[in-house]
């Protein structure tokens, strides 16, 4: 469910040493399943443990997860990263904004999941995103660009070499093409004008 690297485990163990006996960590998602989802880690004293919590046991501490956060923390990864400014704890939870879908889910749901979890985070660096409108009977994904992608001079490149390539590779044999229906208008919002 949640992978915590050995270096991050050692970090948590050290942080917990001076705490009240029985204190562990809590990993959680605020606003799970929404675009505003945020993940966090906090101390969890014994009196804050709920009977419905999921408990993961690590070397020297436990990680507790509330029942609402559990499906959104599937495949989460916690690490302690060395940077120029020091060390930083990172928590990556690819399913925080959207619950992971099953392999046998309808194509529309699986494509939407890949867009939200893999593609939109890449486009967000330019203030952009895509929205899946529908999948046609001939298995063409109809999308619409928004934010910094709308009117961007590089949108055709993003569509063909980015979005379409990634979706066709991911859904080989199921998805035939990706078509953009955006009425692009260049403006101050466009990343590349």
Curated annotation (Swiss-Prot):
[4Fe-4S] cluster binds at residues 149, 152. Keywords: 4Fe-4S, Iron, Iron-sulfur, Metal-binding. Binds 1 [4Fe-4S] cluster per subunit. The cluster is presumably bound at the interface of two monomers. Its cofactor is [4Fe-4S] cluster. One of its GO terms (molecular function) is iron ion binding. One of its GO terms (biological process) is iron-sulfur cluster assembly. Belongs to the NfuA family. Homodimer. This is Fe/S biogenesis protein NfuA. It comes from Psychromonas ingrahamii (strain DSM 17664 / CCUG 51855 / 37). The lineage of its organism: Bacteria, Pseudomonadati, Pseudomonadota, Gammaproteobacteria, Alteromonadales.
